[in-house]
């Protein structure tokens, strides 16, 4: 699997911003089939930083209604990546 297929997008929420500032931990949406080792290698290769830890969880999609039609958003996988002390990704600065 290509490293750019593993990492889909950053998750920018109030909680993820606090984790970034306090624990040097970033949150990404990743491919559901990717494991922790693949995620760590992809982050290290794309952003050129040292990864200490990867934690993952599967987020269930919400049920949404539009009139009588009931639908469901897709499930997705979230990865919380802890970087080495002193390592930062400039992409997230100012967010």
UniProtKB/Swiss-Prot annotation:
One GO CC term on file:
ribonucleoprotein complex
In terms of InterPro entries, this protein maps to: Nucleotide-bd_a/b_plait_sf, Ribosomal_uL23-like, Ribosomal_uL23/eL15/eS24_sf
- What is a biological process (GO) this protein takes part in? translation
Q: Spell out the Gene3D superfamilies in the cross-references.
A: 3.30.70.330
What GO molecular function terms would the record report?
rRNA binding; structural constituent of ribosome
Q: Which UniProt keywords apply?
A: Ribonucleoprotein, Ribosomal protein, RNA-binding, rRNA-binding
- Subunit structure comment from the entry: Part of the 50S ribosomal subunit. Contacts protein L29, and trigger factor when it is bound to the ribosome.
Q: Which family does it belong to?
A: Belongs to the universal ribosomal protein uL23 family.
Protein purpose? One of the early assembly proteins it binds 23S rRNA. One of the proteins that surrounds the polypeptide exit tunnel on the outside of the ribosome. Forms the main docking site for trigger factor binding to the ribosome.
Q: What is this protein's name?
A: Large ribosomal subunit protein uL23
Q: Which organism is it from?
A: Desulfatibacillum aliphaticivorans
Q: Which gene encodes it?
A: rplW
């Amino acid at each position: 699997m290509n490293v750019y297929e593993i990492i889909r997008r950053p998750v920018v929420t109030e909680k993820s911003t606090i984790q970034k500032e306090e624990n040097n931990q970033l949150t990404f949406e990743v491919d559901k089939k990717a494991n922790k080792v693949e995620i760590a290698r992809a982050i290290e290769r794309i952003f050129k930083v040292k990864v200490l830890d990867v934690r993952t969880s599967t987020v269930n999609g919400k049920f949404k209604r539009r009139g009588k039609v009931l639908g469901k958003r897709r499930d997705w996988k979230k990865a919380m990546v802890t970087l080495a002390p002193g390592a930062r990704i400039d992409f997230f600065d100012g967010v």
